[in-house]
Curated annotation (Swiss-Prot):
Pfam families: zf-C3HC4 (PF00097). A zinc finger (RING-type) spans 948-987. The lineage of its organism: Eukaryota, Metazoa, Chordata, Craniata, Vertebrata. This is E3 ubiquitin-protein ligase BRE1B. Residues 1-39, 116-153, 519-646 are annotated as: Disordered. It comes from Pongo abelii (Sumatran orangutan).
Length: 1001
């Protein structure tokens, strides 16, 4: 029945690679082929069927192995192809560059040959030199001598395909390729040598030319500069040639080293490749062993299945003639018996080891006892020795010196540590301050960044809304254009009216200047006529502060009449006060906006009424007859002077108050102007028109009030002035006043025309407003939205400015912190200098310490001398110990011989017991010749094995997981309950969870 298995085993050798066949055949000769059990067979058909099944199974295994081998071979083929491709590529590259090198060398040789032919024609035959040293020139590079050794397939031109070179390499053998490459190498060497010879020849020729030039220069009169230049060039040429030769030598040496390193690299690569091949071989062997292991595992699994199914025993003698058991069963029995024997042997060995361990522990204890006794010697014995006393004295001296040195060292270390700690504390304090400031700066910067991000978001939202509003406003573009055109026309008309008003203002200023001149002339006339001048001064100076302040002038006190002042001083003060009154009135008229001029004109009218009343009251008092007495006139002059001074001070106060009011009104006008700018354009135009109208009306009212005042003044002055010169001047003033009145009439007519035009334009504007009401409403809404957006944008810009200012402040703070850090760094440098000084002092202390250590070494030498005496005593002790050691080996040898004899005795006893068991088995086999009896005996043995060794009645159904010995569950539980918790065989302790029930089928 073992025929198919023999065929399979013989065929297994062909599945491996060819290089492994010999070793595989050698290995297969040593393997044992087990017989194949087919079981009970009733007919030949059943036998053929089982044989075919077995063959199919083996073929399937072989097929799997073959597929695995094919996969591995494919991988190796791919690797080899890749390697071959890389090798071909490198060969092609080497061939191409080698061919290029040969071509360049040939070109250089041609150039040198052509130059040599041209130069050799004029030269003498004696000066020519051959290319070689022996006079036999090498053939030309184009001749056949250099090209014959090289075949054309190894030196293809660049135009030929690279495949020809690879095909030629594949067609030729290794010896041919080596010969061809050697010839090509010789050609390259010869060409390079010729190039070198040509370069040497050129160099020699250059040297000859230089010598000729030098000799010719010596014979012919040349300039010293040319000679020096030629010598310098010659030296430079020689230096460059030497440098070139040195560089060539260096390059040659480096190239040789590089080639050596390349050879080493290639050798290392070859070693790596060899190692890879060995690794692949080992992997192949491992794979083969793995496959063999798989086969054995399959066989073992089949055997276990057959054992579990009870297929391995046949109860009748029909299957096997003579009732014999199978070979595997016999092996199994033998293995079990050997296992039992080995277990017993291991137990005996374990007992021996435990015994030896106990003996070793006893020996260690006995060895430790004298050591402990030596360690625990009484102190009195040690103190009584002379060596101890001598060492104690030396130790006391050395100890005192070491204490002194130690105190000094501790002091130095303490000082150093104190300085270091103070330095570190200062640095930590500085670092903590710096960290705190950095944290504050970071938090402030983060807050500013957050606010900036919020402002940017708001700005983006406003911009988006503004763009939306612009897009909405573009729809009403044509209507807005028409309205703007109409408004621009009205604005142009208003600008014309404003220009006329400005022109009238200038005329009014000129009139006021002329009136001031007249007042000055009138005051001059009062100086010439003293009896009439005082009433004029009082009449001129009194209304000025009344006009500015809007109330009656202050009444002079009785004490003021006693003081005297010159008359010209009073006139000058009155004229200066009037000029100051005129200047702020003009500035107020120019500075006020159109919206604020209406109330100011009303205030002026209200101020003009009390002025008139004051003048009417003062008129009788200031116009006394010229026949008054001189005393009363002098008192009156004093009172006038004092009153003029007081009025000047009050006038200054009033001017300051008016300046404050003007500033406040200017702020209000700025606010109104901002509101006016942010208001819609139609409202702005309407406000401009109304403001211009109010302004014109206010100017007209002011001019009328001034004309009335001037008329009243003229009337009072006509009563006061009696002199002819004054009358003449008054007439001139009246003529000017009439002229101004005529101008005023013309301005009134122009004003009425302007007012009528304003009414017409206002009516047209109202009509247009009624027509475009709805559109204006929409525009107002859009303008309101734009106004809101603009206000929000202004707020955002203000916030942005504030944030920028805060950022600048933070930058200044950062600069301050940097300056603080620099100052702290300076302090750190100072501390480091102090530390260096302390380190220098520490170095001095260390020097002292070295001196002390030298003294300590002297004392140590003394101690060594004392130790030598002790060693002499030790030598005597060692003599005694050597005798003891000589005796101890004899004792150890005798003990070892005795132990060896006991060990051999035990081994002999074990061998005797093992041989006895074999003898008993052999006797059993001889006694029970019949197979049935053998089977019955084996069954009894198996039953005895399956019974519990403790009670010998129940079957084994419990296992101890500590040692895996099997007993019956009742015995194990009884021992556990009786607290005998150790294995009956090996005395291994077990617990409640260490025994389990098993079921043997």
């Amino acid at each position: 029945m073992s025929g198919p298995s023999n065929k399979r085993a013989a065929g297994d050798g062909g599945s491996g690679p060819p290089e492994k066949k010999l070793s595989r055949e050698e290995k297969t000769t040593t393997t044992l082929i087990e017989p194949i059990r087919l079981g009970g067979i009733s007919s030949t058909e059943e036998m053929d069927l089982k044989v075919l099944q077995f063959k199919n199974k083996k073929l399937a295994e072989r097929l799997e192995q073959r597929q695995a081998c094919e996969d591995e071979l494919r991988e190796r083929i791919e690797k080899l192809e890749k390697r071959q491709a890389t090798d071909d590529a490198t060969l092609l590259i080497v061939n191409r560059y080698w061919a290029q090198l040969d071509e360049t060398v040939e070109a250089l040789l041609r150039c040198h040959e052509s130059q040599g032919e041209l130069s050799s024609a004029p030269e003498a035959p004696g000066t020519q030199e051959g290319p070689t040293c022996d006079g036999t020139p090498l053939p030309e590079p184009g001749t056949s001598e250099l090209r014959d050794p090289l075949p054309m397939q190894l030196r293809p031109p660049l135009s030929e395909p690279a495949l020809a070179f690879v095909v030629a390499l594949g067609a030729s053998s290794s010896e041919e390729v080596e010969l061809e490459l050697q010839g090509r190498m010789e050609f390259s060497k010869a060409a390079v040598s010729r190039v070198v010879e040509a370069s040497d020849r050129l160099q020699r020729r250059v040297e000859e030319l230089c010598q000729r030039v030098y000799s010719r220069g010596d014979s012919e009169p040349l300039s010293e500069a040319a000679r020096a230049r030629t010598r310098e060039l010659g030296r430079e040429n020689r230096r460059l040639q030497d440098l070139a030769t040195q560089l060539q030598e260096k390059h040659h040496r480096i190239s040789l080293e590089y080639s050596e390193l390349q050879d080493k690299v290639t050798s290392a690569e070859t070693k790596v490749l060899e190692m890879e091949t060995t690794v692949e071989d080992l992997q192949w062997d491992i794979e083969k062993l793995r496959k063999r292991e798989q086969k054995l595992n399959k066989h073992l699994a089949e055997a276990l299945e057959q054992l579990n199914s009870g297929y391995y025993v046949s109860g009748s003698s029909s299957g096997f003639q003579g009732g014999q058991i199978t070979l595997s069963m016999q092996k199994f029995e033998m293995l079990n018996a050997e296992l039992e024997e080995n277990q017993e042997l291991a137990n005996s060995r374990m007992a021996e080891l435990e015994k030896l361990q106990a003996e070793l522990q006893g020996a260690v204890r006995t060895n430790e006892r004298p050591k402990v006794a030596l360690r625990s010697l009484p102190e009195e014995v040690v103190r009584e020795t002379g060596e101890y006393r001598m060492l104690q004295a030396q130790f006391s001296l050395l100890y005192n010196e070491s204490l002194q040195v130690k105190t000094q060292l501790d002091e130095a270390r303490g000082l150093l540590l104190a300085t270091k700690n103070s330095h570190l504390r200062h640095i930590e304090h500085m670092e903590s301050d710096e960290l705190g400031l950095q944290k504050k700066l970071r938090t402030e910067v983060i807050q500013l960044e957050d606010t900036l991000a919020q402002v940017r978001k708001e700005y983006e939202m406003l911009r988006i809304e503004f763009e939306q509003n612009l897009a909405a406003n573009e729809q009403a573009g044509p209507i807005n254009r028409e309205m703007r055109h109409l408004i621009s026309s009205l604005q142009n008309h208003n600008h014309q009216l404003k220009g006329d008003a400005q022109r009238y203002k200038r005329k009014l200023r000129e009139v006021q200047a002329e009136i001031g001149k007249l007042w000055a002339q009138a005051s001059g006339s009062t100086h010439s006529t003293p009896n009439l001048g005082h009433p004029e001064d009082s009449g001129l100076s009194a209304p000025a502060p009344g006009k500015e302040e809007g109330g009656p002038g202050p009444v002079s006190t009785p004490d003021s009449r006693k003081e005297m002042a010159p008359v010209p001083g009073t006139t000058t003060t009155t004229t200066s006060v009037k000029k100051e009154e005129l200047v702020p009135s003009e500035e107020d008229v120019q500075g006020l906006t159109p919206g604020a001029q209406g109330p100011s004109s009303r205030g002026r009218e209200s101020e003009a009424r009390p002025k008139r009343e004051l003048r009417e009251r003062e008129g009788p008092s200031l116009g006394p007859p010229p026949v008054a007495s001189a005393l009363s006139r002098a008192d009156r002059e004093k009172a006038k002077v004092e009153e003029a001074k007081r009025k000047e001070s009050e006038l200054l106060k009033g001017l300051r108050a008016e300046l404050k009011k003007a500033q406040e009104s200017q702020k209000e006008m700025k606010l109104l102007l901002d509101m006016y700018k942010s208001a819609p354009k139609e409202q702005r135009d309407k406000v401009q028109l109304m403001a211009a109208e109010r302004k014109a009306k206010a100017e007209v009212d002011e001019l009328r009030s001034r004309i009335r005042e001037l008329e009243e003044r003229d009337r009072r002055e006509s009563k006061k002035i009696a002199d002819e010169d004054a009358l003449r001047r008054i007439r001139q003033a009246e003529e000017q006043i009439e002229h101004l009145q005529r101008k005023l009439g013309a301005t009134k007519q122009e004003e009425e025309a302007l007012l009528s035009e304003m009414d017409v334009t206002g009516q047209a504007f109202e009509d247009m407003q009624e027509q475009n009401g709805r559109l204006l409403q929409q525009l107002r809404e859009k303008d309101d939205a734009n106004f809101k957006l603009m206000s929000e944008r202004i707020k955002a810009n203000q916030i942005h400015k504030l944030l920028r200012e805060e950022k600048d402040e933070l930058g200044e703070q950062v600069l301050g912190l940097k300056s603080q850090v620099d100052a702290q760094l300076l302090t750190v440098q100072k501390l480091e200098e102090k530390e260096r000084a302390l380190q220098g002092s520490l170095g001095g202390v260390e020097k002292e310490l070295t001196l002390r250590s030298q003294a300590l070494e002297l004392n140590k030498r003394k101690a060594v001398e004392a130790a030598q005496l002790a060693e002499d005593l030790k030598v005597q002790l060692e003599h005694v110990q050597t005798r003891l050691r000589e005796i101890q080996p004899c004792l150890a040898e005798s003990r070892a011989a005795r132990e060896k004899e006991s060990f051999n005795l035990k081994r002999a006893q074990e061998d005797i017991s093992r041989l006895r068991r074999k003898l008993e088995k052999q006797r059993k086999v001889e006694v029970y010749a019949d197979a049935d009896e053998i089977l019955q005996e084996e069954i009894k043995e198996y039953k005895a094995r399956l019974t519990c060794p403790c009670c010998n009645t129940r079957k084994k159904d419990a296992v101890l997981t500590k040692c895996f010995h099997v007993f019956c569950f009742e015995c194990v539980r009884g021992r556990y309950e009786a607290r005998q918790r150790k294995c009956p065989k090996c005395n291994a302790a077990f617990g409640a969870h260490d025994f389990h029930r098993i079921y043997i089928s």
